[in-house]
C-alpha cells in the first residue's frame, strides 16, 4: 500500500538544508536578505506561483541555478508573513484545522495577502475560514476592510458580518428595539434599555452616513403605537398619585413615574427627528392642567418629588418649544392656557432646583439639577408664545409677571415688544386701513 501524500510530505522539514533541493531567496529594499531552504515538491503542489517558476515553461528556466533559487522581493511589512506562509505550506492539508494554522487576526490577514499573491489556494481558504469565524477588534476591522476586498470573491465570506441588510430586517429590529425602549422592564435591564434608546437615535440620525432607517408611514405608525402605550402608563401613574399622593409607590425610589417621564423626554427627541411630534404635543397640552395640579400637591421637601418636577419640566420645555416656534400649531386658547399653567409652575420650581437638594446628610450629594440651556430655552419659548397671543392676553401675563418683581422667566423682551406695538398700534393699523381705503377708491 502506497503512503498517502501528506504522509510523504511529512518527511520534508521546512528549512532542512540537507534535504532541500531549492532555495527561496527573500529580499526587500531595506537590504534584508534571507535564504530559506525548501523543497520543490512542496512548493509546486501548494503554490501555483512556485509551480510556474519551477516549470520548464518559465522564461529563465535554462539559466544556470534559476531552478534551484527563486528570488522573491517583498515589502518589509510583509516580510515575516512570507516566511510564515512558506512554513505553512509544509503543514497545510485537509486534515489540519484552521485554528492550528492561524493564531491571530493580524497574522491571518498578512498571510492571506501573501497567499493570494503567491497563488496558494489552500492557505487562502484556511485564512478566510479563520477570519470569518473569529471576533475582531475595532482596529482589526478597519484593516480587514482595507485588505480583504483586494483578495477577490473567495474572501467574500469574511465580510458577511459587515454587509448591509434589507430594509425589512432593519424595520423589524427597529420596531423591537423601540418597543423595548418605551417599556418598563425590571431595573436590572436598565442598561440594556438605555443602550436600545441610544442605538435607535443612532439609526435615524444622519451624520457622515445616511440614516439606517427612513421614517416612512409604516415606521411612523409603529412609533405612534408605542408612544400611545407609553402615555397609557403615564396616565396610570398620574391616577395613582391622584389617589394616594404621599403613599404612592410610583414616586418612591423604585417607582415608575420618573422612569416614564424620562422615557417621554427621550421619545420626544425621536419624534422630533421623525417629524411626528404633533400628537405628543396635543396630548401633553390636554393633560397639562391635571398634571400641574397633581405634581404641585406633592411635598416639595421629598427628594423624589423634586426630581419628578425636574423631569416634568424637561418634557414640558420640549413641548413649549415646539409650540413657541410653530412646529405644532395650536389654537389661541390652548396656547394661552399653556402659558398660564406652566409659567407659574416653572417659576415655582426653579428655586427648588437651584437650591441644592441633598439625598441624605451622610454623603452630602447634590442631586437633580436642570441644565442651564433648558431654563434659557424655556424662557425663549415662553416669550415666543406670549408675543403671538392677542395684545390683551399679553398685557394680562406681563402684569402678573411684573407683580412678581420680574422673577424667572425673564419676559423683558416680550414686555418691550408689547410696549412698542401698543404705542404705535393706532398709527400702524390706521395706516393699513388708509391704504386699503385708497386702494378701493
Curated annotation (Swiss-Prot):
Q: Start and end of every BTB domain?
A: 20-98
Could you tell me which InterPro entries the record lists for this protein?
BTB/POZ_dom (IPR000210), BTB/POZ_dom_prot (IPR038920), SKP1/BTB/POZ_sf (IPR011333)
- Tell me the Gene Ontology biological-process terms attached to this UniProt entry: protein ubiquitination
Query: Which keywords, in A-to-Z order, does the entry hold?
Result: Ubl conjugation pathway
Q: Which pathway is it part of? A: Protein modification; protein ubiquitination
**Domain of life of the organism encoding this protein:** Eukaryota
Q: What is known of its domains?
A: The BTB/POZ domain mediates the interaction with some component of ubiquitin ligase complexes.
What is the documented function of this protein?
May act as a substrate-specific adapter of an E3 ubiquitin-protein ligase complex (CUL3-RBX1-BTB) which mediates the ubiquitination and subsequent proteasomal degradation of target proteins.
* UniProt-recorded name of the protein: BTB/POZ domain-containing protein At3g05675
| Organism annotation | Arabidopsis thaliana
Amino acid at each position: 500500500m502506497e503512503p498517502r501524500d501528506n504522509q510523504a510530505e511529512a518527511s520534508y522539514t521546512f528549512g532542512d538544508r540537507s534535504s532541500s533541493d531549492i532555495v527561496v531567496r527573500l529580499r526587500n529594499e531595506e537590504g534584508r536578505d534571507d535564504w530559506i531552504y525548501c523543497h520543490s515538491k512542496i512548493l509546486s503542489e501548494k503554490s501555483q506561483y512556485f509551480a510556474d517558476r519551477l516549470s520548464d515553461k518559465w522564461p529563465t528556466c535554462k539559466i544556470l541555478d534559476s531552478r534551484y533559487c527563486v528570488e522573491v522581493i517583498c515589502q518589509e511589512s510583509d516580510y515575516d508573513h512570507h516566511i510564515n506562509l512558506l512554513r505553512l505550506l509544509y503543514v497545510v492539508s485537509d486534515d489540519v484545522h484552521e485554528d492550528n494554522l492561524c493564531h491571530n487576526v493580524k497574522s491571518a490577514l498578512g498571510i492571506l495577502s501573501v497567499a493570494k499573491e503567491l497563488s496558494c489556494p489552500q492557505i487562502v481558504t484556511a485564512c478566510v475560514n479563520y477570519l470569518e469565524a473569529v471576533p475582531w477588534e475595532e482596529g482589526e476591522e478597519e484593516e480587514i476592510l482595507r485588505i480583504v476586498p483586494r483578495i477577490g470573491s473567495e474572501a467574500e465570506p469574511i465580510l458577511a458580518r459587515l454587509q448591509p441588510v434589507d430594509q425589512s430586517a432593519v424595520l423589524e429590529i427597529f420596531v423591537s428595539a423601540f418597543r423595548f425602549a418605551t417599556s418598563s422592564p425590571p431595573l436590572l435591564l436598565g442598561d440594556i434599555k438605555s443602550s436600545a434608546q441610544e442605538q435607535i437615535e443612532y439609526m435615524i440620525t444622519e451624520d457622515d452616513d445616511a440614516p439606517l432607517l427612513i421614517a416612512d408611514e409604516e415606521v411612523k405608525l409603529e412609533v405612534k403605537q408605542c408612544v400611545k402605550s407609553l402615555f397609557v402608563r403615564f396616565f396610570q401613574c398620574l391616577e395613582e398619585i391622584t389617589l394616594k399622593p404621599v403613599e404612592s409607590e410610583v414616586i418612591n425610589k423604585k417607582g415608575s413615574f420618573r422612569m416614564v417621564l424620562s422615557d417621554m423626554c427621550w421619545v420626544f427627541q425621536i419624534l422630533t427627528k421623525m417629524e411626528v411630534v404633533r400628537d405628543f404635543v396635543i396630548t401633553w397640552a390636554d393633560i397639562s392642567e391635571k398634571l400641574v395640579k397633581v405634581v404641585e400637591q406633592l411635598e416639595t421637601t421629598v427628594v423624589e418629588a423634586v426630581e419628578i418636577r425636574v423631569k416634568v419640566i424637561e418634557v414640558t420645555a420640549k413641548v413649549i418649544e415646539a409650540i413657541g416656534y410653530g412646529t405644532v400649531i395650536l389654537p389661541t386658547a390652548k396656547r394661552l392656557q399653556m402659558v398660564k399653567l406652566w409659567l407659574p409652575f416653572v417659576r415655582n420650581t426653579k428655586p427648588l432646583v437651584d437650591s441644592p437638594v441633598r439625598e441624605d446628610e451622610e454623603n452630602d450629594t447634590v442631586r437633580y439639577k436642570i441644565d442651564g440651556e433648558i431654563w434659557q430655552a424655556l424662557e425663549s419659548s415662553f416669550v415666543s408664545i406670549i408675543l403671538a397671543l392677542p395684545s390683551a392676553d399679553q398685557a394680562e401675563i406681563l402684569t402678573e409677571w411684573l407683580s412678581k418683581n420680574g422673577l424667572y422667566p425673564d419676559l423683558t423682551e416680550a414686555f418691550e415688544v408689547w410696549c412698542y406695538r401698543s404705542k404705535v398700534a393706532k398709527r400702524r393699523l390706521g395706516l393699513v386701513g388708509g391704504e386699503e381705503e385708497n386702494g378701493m377708491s
